Amino acid sequence: MYAIVEIGGKQYKVEKDHFIYVYRLEGAEGSAVTFDNVLLLADNNQYQVGAPSVAGASVSGKILEHLKDDKVTAFKKKRRKGFRKTVGFRQSLTKVLITSLN
C-alpha cells in the first residue's frame, strides 16, 4: 500500500514505515504530523485518485529530526574585470517517518 501526497508544493510517494526528507516543517522533533492532501491512494490493484485530493484520506507521520542538506555553491564572474563572487546555500530539511496511511 502506498500513497502520493503533496507536502510543501512537492509530490512524494510514501509507504508505511519509510522515511522521507521534506522542506522544513513547523513542529518539534518527536511530534506527530498529519498530511491531508493525498492525491492518490493505492492498495494492491485498487487505486483511488483524487480530484484534486482523495476525500477522507490522510497520511500520518512523526518528525524525527531537523537537518540541513549539503551545500550548493553558486559562482559568478565577469571576465576581464576581476569580479568574482561565491555564494553557498544549504536547504533546511525535515526527516519524517511515515506511521500510517488512512
From Swiss-Prot:
Q: Which PROSITE patterns match?
A: RIBOSOMAL_L21
Which Pfam families does UniProt cross-reference here? Ribosomal_L21p (PF00829)
Q: Which GO terms describe its molecular function?
A: rRNA binding; structural constituent of ribosome
Which top-level group of life is the source organism from? Bacteria
The protein's matches in InterPro entries, at most eight in alphabetical order, are given as: bL21-like, bL21-like_sf, Ribosomal_bL21, Ribosomal_bL21_CS
A cellular component term from Gene Ontology for this protein is: cytoplasm
Query: What's a GO biological-process term for it?
Result: translation
Keywords for the protein's UniProt record, in alphabetical order: Ribonucleoprotein, Ribosomal protein, RNA-binding, rRNA-binding
Q: Which family does it belong to?
A: Belongs to the bacterial ribosomal protein bL21 family.
Assembly, in brief, is: Part of the 50S ribosomal subunit. Contacts protein L20.
Q: HAMAP family of this UniProt entry?
A: Ribosomal_bL21
Q: What does this protein do?
A: This protein binds to 23S rRNA in the presence of protein L20.
- List the PANTHER family: 50S RIBOSOMAL PROTEIN L21, LARGE RIBOSOMAL SUBUNIT PROTEIN BL21M
Which named protein is this? Large ribosomal subunit protein bL21
